[in-house]
Protein backbone atom coordinates (compact mmCIF):
# COMPACT_ATOMS: atom_id res chain seq x y z
CA UNK A 1 0.00 0.00 0.00
CA UNK A 2 2.92 2.35 0.66
CA UNK A 3 3.74 2.23 -3.05
CA UNK A 4 0.14 2.82 -4.14
CA UNK A 5 -0.90 -0.73 -5.02
CA UNK A 6 -3.71 -1.98 -2.80
CA UNK A 7 -6.07 -3.99 -5.00
CA UNK A 8 -8.47 -5.09 -2.25
CA UNK A 9 -11.15 -3.75 0.04
CA UNK A 10 -11.59 -4.68 3.68
CA UNK A 11 -13.97 -5.36 6.58
CA UNK A 12 -12.82 -4.57 10.12
CA UNK A 13 -13.34 -7.94 11.83
CA UNK A 14 -12.21 -8.91 15.32
CA UNK A 15 -12.61 -12.42 16.70
CA UNK A 16 -11.90 -14.40 19.87
CA UNK A 17 -12.32 -18.06 18.99
CA UNK A 18 -11.77 -21.45 20.62
CA UNK A 19 -10.55 -24.10 18.17
CA UNK A 20 -10.50 -27.88 18.56
CA UNK A 21 -8.80 -29.94 15.85
CA UNK A 22 -8.66 -33.69 15.32
CA UNK A 23 -6.47 -35.42 12.74
CA UNK A 24 -7.89 -38.34 10.78
CA UNK A 25 -6.30 -41.26 8.91
CA UNK A 26 -3.14 -43.22 9.50
CA UNK A 27 -0.97 -40.47 8.00
CA UNK A 28 -3.08 -37.61 9.39
CA UNK A 29 -4.31 -36.86 5.89
CA UNK A 30 -7.66 -35.61 7.20
CA UNK A 31 -8.53 -32.81 9.60
CA UNK A 32 -11.73 -32.04 11.48
CA UNK A 33 -11.89 -28.58 13.08
CA UNK A 34 -14.56 -27.03 15.27
CA UNK A 35 -14.39 -23.30 16.05
CA UNK A 36 -16.64 -21.26 18.31
CA UNK A 37 -16.38 -17.75 19.65
CA UNK A 38 -17.23 -14.07 19.54
CA UNK A 39 -16.85 -11.96 16.40
CA UNK A 40 -17.34 -8.30 15.61
CA UNK A 41 -17.66 -6.74 12.14
CA UNK A 42 -17.37 -3.01 11.50
CA UNK A 43 -17.96 -1.08 8.30
CA UNK A 44 -14.98 1.25 7.99
CA UNK A 45 -13.90 3.92 5.55
CA UNK A 46 -10.31 4.05 4.29
CA UNK A 47 -8.08 6.40 6.27
CA UNK A 48 -5.96 7.08 3.21
CA UNK A 49 -7.26 7.80 -0.26
CA UNK A 50 -3.87 7.12 -1.81
CA UNK A 51 -0.27 6.38 -0.91
CA UNK A 52 1.65 9.16 0.90
CA UNK A 53 4.30 8.64 -1.77
CA UNK A 54 3.54 10.03 -5.24
CA UNK A 55 3.35 6.52 -6.69
CA UNK A 56 0.68 4.15 -7.94
CA UNK A 57 -3.04 4.77 -8.09
CA UNK A 58 -5.71 5.71 -5.49
CA UNK A 59 -6.77 2.97 -3.08
CA UNK A 60 -10.07 1.16 -3.52
CA UNK A 61 -13.04 2.20 -1.42
CA UNK A 62 -14.31 -0.44 0.98
CA UNK A 63 -17.52 -2.05 -0.22
CA UNK A 64 -20.63 -1.84 2.00
CA UNK A 65 -20.60 -4.06 5.10
CA UNK A 66 -23.10 -4.48 7.93
CA UNK A 67 -21.70 -3.78 11.41
CA UNK A 68 -22.61 -6.01 14.33
CA UNK A 69 -21.54 -8.40 17.08
CA UNK A 70 -22.28 -12.10 16.79
CA UNK A 71 -21.42 -15.58 17.98
CA UNK A 72 -19.69 -17.55 15.24
CA UNK A 73 -19.55 -21.34 14.95
CA UNK A 74 -17.60 -23.13 12.21
CA UNK A 75 -17.14 -26.82 11.39
CA UNK A 76 -14.50 -27.71 8.78
CA UNK A 77 -13.51 -31.07 7.31
CA UNK A 78 -10.40 -31.30 5.13
CA UNK A 79 -8.93 -34.28 3.33
CA UNK A 80 -5.47 -33.90 1.81
CA UNK A 81 -5.15 -30.11 2.23
CA UNK A 82 -1.71 -30.41 0.61
CA UNK A 83 -3.36 -31.09 -2.78
CA UNK A 84 -3.90 -27.75 -4.56
CA UNK A 85 -3.57 -26.23 -8.01
CA UNK A 86 -0.72 -24.09 -6.71
CA UNK A 87 1.33 -27.05 -5.40
CA UNK A 88 2.93 -30.01 -7.17
CA UNK A 89 1.70 -32.81 -4.91
CA UNK A 90 -0.69 -35.12 -6.82
CA UNK A 91 -3.91 -36.62 -5.52
CA UNK A 92 -7.44 -35.65 -4.56
CA UNK A 93 -8.28 -33.07 -1.91
CA UNK A 94 -11.54 -31.96 -0.32
CA UNK A 95 -12.61 -29.17 2.02
CA UNK A 96 -16.13 -28.82 3.44
CA UNK A 97 -17.13 -25.91 5.70
CA UNK A 98 -20.31 -25.01 7.54
CA UNK A 99 -20.58 -21.66 9.35
CA UNK A 100 -23.38 -20.20 11.46
CA UNK A 101 -23.69 -16.77 13.07
CA UNK A 102 -26.18 -15.69 15.75
CA UNK A 103 -26.59 -12.24 17.26
CA UNK A 104 -26.80 -8.84 15.62
CA UNK A 105 -25.60 -10.54 12.44
CA UNK A 106 -27.31 -13.81 11.54
CA UNK A 107 -26.55 -16.14 8.66
CA UNK A 108 -25.68 -19.68 7.64
CA UNK A 109 -23.02 -20.42 5.05
CA UNK A 110 -21.73 -23.66 3.51
CA UNK A 111 -18.82 -24.16 1.12
CA UNK A 112 -17.23 -27.10 -0.66
CA UNK A 113 -13.89 -27.36 -2.43
CA UNK A 114 -12.79 -30.36 -4.50
CA UNK A 115 -9.30 -30.52 -6.03
CA UNK A 116 -7.54 -33.09 -8.19
CA UNK A 117 -4.00 -32.97 -9.56
CA UNK A 118 -1.85 -35.42 -11.52
CA UNK A 119 1.75 -35.16 -12.69
CA UNK A 120 3.13 -36.96 -15.74
CA UNK A 121 6.79 -36.11 -16.15
CA UNK A 122 7.05 -32.41 -16.96
CA UNK A 123 3.27 -32.24 -17.55
CA UNK A 124 0.94 -31.38 -14.66
CA UNK A 125 -2.87 -31.44 -14.86
CA UNK A 126 -5.17 -30.00 -12.22
CA UNK A 127 -8.78 -29.02 -11.61
CA UNK A 128 -10.64 -27.40 -8.72
CA UNK A 129 -14.35 -26.92 -8.10
CA UNK A 130 -15.64 -24.45 -5.48
CA UNK A 131 -19.33 -24.28 -4.59
CA UNK A 132 -21.06 -22.24 -1.91
CA UNK A 133 -24.39 -21.08 -0.56
CA UNK A 134 -25.24 -18.53 2.12
CA UNK A 135 -28.45 -17.16 3.61
CA UNK A 136 -30.24 -14.77 1.20
CA UNK A 137 -30.53 -12.29 4.09
CA UNK A 138 -26.87 -12.59 5.11
CA UNK A 139 -24.85 -9.37 5.52
CA UNK A 140 -23.14 -8.27 2.29
CA UNK A 141 -19.68 -9.25 3.53
CA UNK A 142 -20.85 -12.90 3.57
CA UNK A 143 -21.94 -12.96 -0.08
CA UNK A 144 -19.82 -14.72 -2.69
CA UNK A 145 -17.93 -12.42 -5.05
CA UNK A 146 -16.25 -13.21 -8.37
CA UNK A 147 -14.02 -11.06 -10.52
CA UNK A 148 -10.48 -10.17 -11.51
CA UNK A 149 -8.88 -11.08 -8.17
CA UNK A 150 -11.56 -13.58 -7.15
CA UNK A 151 -10.95 -16.65 -9.37
CA UNK A 152 -12.35 -15.09 -12.56
CA UNK A 153 -9.61 -13.06 -14.30
CA UNK A 154 -10.61 -11.01 -17.30
CA UNK A 155 -13.55 -9.36 -15.53
CA UNK A 156 -13.75 -6.31 -13.27
CA UNK A 157 -12.90 -6.43 -9.58
CA UNK A 158 -15.75 -8.24 -7.76
CA UNK A 159 -17.98 -7.68 -10.78
CA UNK A 160 -20.33 -10.50 -9.76
CA UNK A 161 -21.91 -11.35 -6.40
CA UNK A 162 -24.70 -13.47 -4.99
CA UNK A 163 -25.79 -15.88 -2.28
CA UNK A 164 -25.13 -18.98 -4.43
CA UNK A 165 -21.96 -19.53 -6.45
CA UNK A 166 -19.83 -22.09 -8.24
CA UNK A 167 -16.38 -21.78 -9.82
CA UNK A 168 -14.56 -24.44 -11.86
CA UNK A 169 -10.86 -23.98 -12.61
CA UNK A 170 -8.62 -26.12 -14.77
CA UNK A 171 -4.90 -25.89 -15.40
CA UNK A 172 -2.35 -27.57 -17.65
CA UNK A 173 1.32 -26.89 -16.90
CA UNK A 174 4.30 -27.95 -18.99
CA UNK A 175 7.82 -27.47 -17.70
CA UNK A 176 10.64 -26.77 -20.14
CA UNK A 177 12.99 -29.16 -18.34
CA UNK A 178 15.78 -26.61 -17.91
CA UNK A 179 17.25 -24.80 -14.88
CA UNK A 180 15.63 -27.34 -12.59
CA UNK A 181 18.43 -27.52 -10.02
CA UNK A 182 18.68 -25.21 -6.97
CA UNK A 183 21.15 -22.35 -7.27
CA UNK A 184 24.05 -22.47 -4.84
CA UNK A 185 25.16 -19.07 -3.54
CA UNK A 186 27.37 -20.17 -0.64
CA UNK A 187 27.93 -23.39 1.30
CA UNK A 188 24.79 -22.71 3.35
CA UNK A 189 22.75 -20.44 1.09
CA UNK A 190 20.75 -21.88 -1.81
CA UNK A 191 18.10 -20.34 -4.02
CA UNK A 192 15.17 -22.32 -5.45
CA UNK A 193 15.44 -23.38 -9.10
CA UNK A 194 14.13 -21.11 -11.84
CA UNK A 195 12.41 -24.07 -13.57
CA UNK A 196 10.50 -22.14 -16.26
CA UNK A 197 7.32 -23.50 -17.80
CA UNK A 198 4.12 -22.51 -19.55
CA UNK A 199 0.65 -22.81 -18.01
CA UNK A 200 -2.79 -22.73 -19.60
CA UNK A 201 -5.62 -22.00 -17.17
CA UNK A 202 -9.36 -21.91 -17.80
CA UNK A 203 -11.94 -20.60 -15.32
CA UNK A 204 -15.75 -20.74 -15.39
CA UNK A 205 -17.98 -19.16 -12.75
CA UNK A 206 -21.66 -18.76 -11.97
CA UNK A 207 -23.31 -16.74 -9.21
CA UNK A 208 -26.97 -15.93 -8.60
CA UNK A 209 -29.30 -14.15 -6.19
CA UNK A 210 -31.98 -16.59 -5.07
CA UNK A 211 -34.45 -14.03 -3.65
CA UNK A 212 -35.34 -10.34 -4.05
CA UNK A 213 -33.59 -9.66 -0.73
CA UNK A 214 -30.40 -11.24 -2.05
CA UNK A 215 -30.67 -9.22 -5.26
CA UNK A 216 -31.01 -6.02 -3.21
CA UNK A 217 -27.76 -6.87 -1.42
CA UNK A 218 -26.02 -7.49 -4.75
CA UNK A 219 -27.21 -4.08 -5.96
CA UNK A 220 -25.97 -2.41 -2.77
CA UNK A 221 -22.53 -3.92 -3.36
CA UNK A 222 -22.47 -2.42 -6.83
CA UNK A 223 -22.15 -5.87 -8.38
CA UNK A 224 -24.36 -8.02 -10.61
CA UNK A 225 -25.25 -11.68 -10.99
CA UNK A 226 -23.59 -13.55 -13.84
CA UNK A 227 -26.88 -14.41 -15.57
CA UNK A 228 -25.10 -17.36 -17.18
CA UNK A 229 -21.77 -19.12 -16.85
CA UNK A 230 -18.89 -16.66 -17.34
CA UNK A 231 -15.50 -17.96 -18.39
CA UNK A 232 -11.97 -16.80 -19.12
CA UNK A 233 -8.63 -18.30 -20.11
CA UNK A 234 -5.00 -17.31 -19.62
CA UNK A 235 -1.66 -18.46 -20.98
CA UNK A 236 1.25 -17.55 -18.71
CA UNK A 237 4.98 -18.16 -18.41
CA UNK A 238 5.93 -19.37 -14.93
CA UNK A 239 9.17 -19.70 -13.03
Annotate each PLM feature.
Residues 26, 72, 90-239:
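C-terminal transmembrane beta-barrel domains of outer membrane proteins
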Amino acid sequence: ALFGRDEYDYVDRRTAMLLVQHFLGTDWQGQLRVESGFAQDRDVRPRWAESPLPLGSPFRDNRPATSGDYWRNVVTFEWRPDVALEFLRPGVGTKLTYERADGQLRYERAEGRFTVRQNHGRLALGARLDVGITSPTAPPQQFFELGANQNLPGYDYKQFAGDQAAVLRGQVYRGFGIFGAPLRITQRVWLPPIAPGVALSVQAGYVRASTPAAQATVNALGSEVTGHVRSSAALTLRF
